[in-house]
C-alpha cells in the first residue's frame, strides 16, 4: 500500500490522502474527493501504475475523475460510493467519462455492497 500526501492547496476536498493498494499485479486507486486539477498534479508528481479498479472520486461529481487521470492510470473498473443525495451524484457527465474510458462501472446505490476479490 502506498499513501500519498495531499497535493491540493485549498478546501477540505483537496487535502485528503491518495491511497494505492497493490496485491501482485492488481492495483486499486482511491483519490478521495479531489478535483481534476489536483488529480493532474497527482499524475504529474507520482509514477502511478495502470490500475484495475478506481474508487471514483467525490461520489461521481462532474469535477472529479477527470480525463487526465483516466488516461494516465487506465482503470478497467470504477466503483462509485453513492446514495440518495441532493447533489445529483453521480453526474451524467462523470458517468460518460467513465464509459468513454472503457470502464465497467459499479454503483453502491444500484448494486449495494460491492465485493472485489483478487486471485
Task: Spell out what each predicted region is.
Residues 1-53, 110-119:
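Core dinuclear metal-dependent hydrolase active-site scaffold
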Residues 41-113:
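Cap/insert and terminal regions of metallo-dependent hydrolase folds
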Amino acid at each position: 500500500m502506498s499513501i500519498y500526501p495531499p497535493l491540493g492547496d485549498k478546501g477540505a476536498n483537496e487535502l485528503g490522502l491518495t491511497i494505492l493498494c497493490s496485491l501482485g499485479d492488481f492495483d486499486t486507486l482511491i483519490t478521495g474527493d479531489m478535483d481534476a486539477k489536483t488529480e493532474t498534479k497527482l499524475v504529474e508528481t507520482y509514477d502511478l501504475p495502470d490500475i484495475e479498479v478506481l474508487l471514483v472520486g467525490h461520489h461521481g461529481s462532474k469535477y472529479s475523475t477527470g480525463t487526465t487521470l483516466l488516461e494516465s492510470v487506465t482503470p478497467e473498473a470504477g466503483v462509485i460510493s453513492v446514495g440518495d443525495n441532493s447533489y445529483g451524484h453521480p453526474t451524467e457527465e462523470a458517468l460518460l467519462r467513465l464509459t468513454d474510458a472503457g470502464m465497467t462501472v459499479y454503483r453502491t446505490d444500484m448494486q449495494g455492497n460491492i465485493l472485489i476479490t483478487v486471485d
